[in-house]
Amino acid sequence: MTTQWDEVGSVAGVGSLDLGPLKESLHRQVIDSLDLTIIAKLDGGQLKAELSKLVTELLESESVPLSMKEREELISDIQHEVMGLGPLEPLVQDQTVNDILVNRCDQIYVERAGKLELTDIKFRDEGHLRKIIEKIVSAVGRRIDESSPMVDARLLDGSRVNAIIPPLALDGSSISIRKFSKDKLQITDLVEKRSLTPEIAELLRGIVEARLNILISGGTGTGKTTILNILSSFIPTDERIVTIEDSAELQLRQEHVVRLETRPPNVEGRGEVSQRELVKNCLRMRPDRIVMGEVRSGECLDMLQAMNTGHDGSLTTIHANTPRDCLTRVETLVAMAGLNLATKALRHYISSAIDVVLQMTRLSDGSRKMTSLSEIVGMEGETITLQEIFLFKQTGLDEQRKVHGTFMASGVRPKFVERFKALGIAVDADIFDPEKIYEV
């Protein structure tokens, strides 16, 4: 008996069988055969078993010549198509992958341990990639088409997704997925990874306990959110915390936490709730501290106002490459809020709101380090005075191209040490000795 698959393969030449058309056909048949009212009641394991049974029956009815390994791979691929993100699902499940970057249907990169790698995973074609994109965005009530060719979304596990399609994406649709880590890292993890020293780790704990306002600066993928999560864990459990994010990533351990997230506009362009609105509402919620995932626009002004009006110990992050650039960036974002202040007055406002700037950097070996800890100590003329307390200096690379370097104290004794003393927070004065060098 001849089947529709005899044209693409045979028992004698199973290795030449093109499984692409077979997967597509089976996928359509599986969707047509599934009773949606029943599968809605099944958990993941039950649904996987039902899909396996259904695909096996369809394969037998088509008399498709497949080896056991090919059959298992095909069943797994169909399960990924129905239950997950198709070819991307194994990458989503891979705990070593931090970012998934689809440049086009046949070019997919991942980031592992700070390094980019080209994978051999591909979509069948542009249409296949678009189906997965539409599956992602429809799950969060969004749409993507020529009239709305860019979308930010979130997977069920919290991973952030950005998708962009033609005509804006010239080489075909593109997806960027920043995976959501389920591991709640602690400060000891950063010490073990040589991102900072035990002495600096204890100093950071004291900075949070002393209710200093902290701005974490860094480029994309430098570990800003990771350090924000860790520093937030030092907030005492008897304080009320309100978090504000564009896309929920923070994983605070405390019980008394209210989590707020922005809302994009709906398909009609209505219903948007911005970070600015959430900050303003947050101030009516009696927070002891505000933790904002990142300041990107005019909400920077509202965050500074909160820091200046009794919400000491608040924390946020910002995109900038150096501590000084970070302050310039803050000025730019405040201007986006429409505040018309003289330069000196604006800088005085910034200097009175922010106490400490942490600079995060991703180095050439992919490692992420805190490369500077600085204190804002006021104004000198029209310039914000920024004193560097610690800095990381790269000294070289080993045979594996791993970065080696030292953390060094500048010799400046920070003003916040007096606050530590008043609050009974212990600090070893020797750590500010410029003669002491901490190798990592």
Identify the residue ranges that each predicted region occupies.
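N-terminal anchoring/assembly modules that precede and organize ATP-driven motor systems
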Residues: 1-117
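Active-site phosphate-binding and catalytic loops of NTP-dependent enzymes
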Residues: 38-41, 61-68, 83-94, 136-153, ...
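NTP-binding/hydrolysis catalytic cores, primarily Walker-type P-loop NTPases
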Residues: 366-440
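Solvent-exposed alpha-helical segments within well-ordered globular domains of core cellular machineries
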Residues: 20, 24, 28, 32, ...
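Conserved glycine(s) of the Walker
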Residues: 223
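Switch/coupling sub-region of P-loop NTPases
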Residues: 201, 205-217, 226, 230-353, ...
